[in-house]
Every structure is written in C-alpha cells, then in structure tokens.
C-alpha cells in the first residue's frame, strides 16, 4: 500500500467524520424546530414568521449532507477495494465455493448493518423504533405528496425494510369497495407512519391540552381526521379524549365525541384536509 493511497483514505475518513458531525448539528436544530412548532403551532400563522422556511432549509441541508456522506463512503469503498488482493486461492477458493450462497446473505446483512452504522444515533433509534412496530396498528398516510388532501387510516405493520427505510402495511378494512378487492397493502416511507400511544401505558403517553389540534380516529371508522381537544383523559378521569372533529357539523354546531387516548396522535405539520 503506497503512501499516497493511505493519505487519500485518511483524508476521506476525516471528511466522513466532518459530514457526520455536521449532520448531528443539523438534526439538533431540526428537533428544536419540531419542539417549537409542536408547542406553539399557531406561530406559523403570524405575519413575518419564517419557521416553516427555516425548517425546510434545515431539511435541505440534512439531505445534502446525507447524500455527500454516501458519496464519500462509496469513494472510500472503492479505494479499499483497489488495495485489497484479488480473490482467494487454493483452500480458500474451495471453501468459498461451498458457502457462496451463505456469504451472499451475510453480505446483504452486512450492507444493511453498515448503512445503520453510518446514520446518526437519533436516526438509528428511530429506525429501531419503526422496526419494532411489526404486528402493531399505526396511523398511515396513504395519499401522495401531490394530493389535494391527506388521507390517514389505521393499518397494521407487516414489515419494515431497514435498507429502503420503507414500512409495509396492511389496510385490513379498506372501506366500501364495490369491486370487493379486500385487504390492501402499501409500502410507505417512514414520514407517512405515525405510531399510536401504547394502550397499556397511559402514564407515559403525551397528553394534548384543551384547544390543541390533533389527528384522531373518527368513532366507528378506521379513518383519522383533524380534531380539537375539548377535554383530556386526565380531566375526565378516563382513558378517552373529548374531541370536536373539523367538518363534523350537525345542526350548526360541532358535536363532541369521545375517542380513546391510544387513537389520538399529534397533528402532522402541513396537514391538508
């Protein structure tokens, strides 16, 4: 291995470290903005507020840093491949021929594991959280970004792909379908999935205060709609919220409906209904 080769590899490893540190800093700022908007969502309606524009720029930075990290990682892999000896010989070659299929599976696992290692700690934790959702019901947005309205439904997680970061879900009750197509599956990005609070752990569940806008399962359906909190489970001494759903007007007024706390989640930023 020549000195120039070593120098090039070391320079790229330093660049990789810098990119990861920059990503950590950007993610910290993104989390700060999320907390700010969750605490005071009405702030975006104030004249001159640039919170959403700032958040968008932060996501653009995060995306660029992530793409640069992938580029540098690929360069490093190429540099290392060029320095490694070509192929095994003798006993090694015969052994690899016997276990080629097993090694292929191992390489696939290693690729997924290395992808996770390159991610920030917060993103790794998020990926583990989504991987643990298999078999559970979640809220899923099944409409495209370009759609006029967001449609959210209760679905069941059947698989999480760590490599593509996609969640495969099953809509067990697709609604009234004249063709009777039955259950339907979707592959959705993580951003389209909202985990529900744990039914058996109400004490560790975030409670939304009166007046807060939320996304909740409409009684008797598997669809979620925007609603306003009227009363909390704690105040009602029960496990249900008292909510008023948008566009649910009856006789000139919005009826108040009860919804279990484990079917209520935070309203996504930019929700369209």
UniProtKB/Swiss-Prot annotation:
For biological process, the GO terms are:
chromatin organization; response to salt stress
Where does it localize? Nucleus
Query: What keywords sit in the KW lines?
Result: Chromatin regulator, Nucleus, Transcription, Transcription regulation
- In the record, which residues are listed under signal peptide? none
Could you tell me which residues belong to the region Histone H3K4me3 N-terminus binding?
Answer: 171-173, 220-223
PROSITE patterns referenced in this protein's UniProt entry, alphabetically: SGF29_C
Write down any Gene Ontology CC term: SAGA complex
Q: Name one Pfam family in it.
A: SGF29_Tudor
**Which PANTHER family has this protein been placed in?**
SAGA-ASSOCIATED FACTOR 29 (PTHR21539:SF0)
Read off the domain note. Answer: The SGF29 tudor-like domain mediates binding to methylated 'Lys-4' of histone H3 (H3K4me).
Family to which the UniProt record says this protein belongs:
Belongs to the SGF29 family.
The function of this protein is: Chromatin reader component of the transcription regulatory histone acetylation (HAT) complex SAGA.
Name recorded for this polypeptide? SAGA-associated factor 29 homolog B
From which organism does this entry originate?
Answer: Arabidopsis thaliana
Upper classification of the source organism reads: Eukaryota, Viridiplantae, Streptophyta, Embryophyta, Tracheophyta
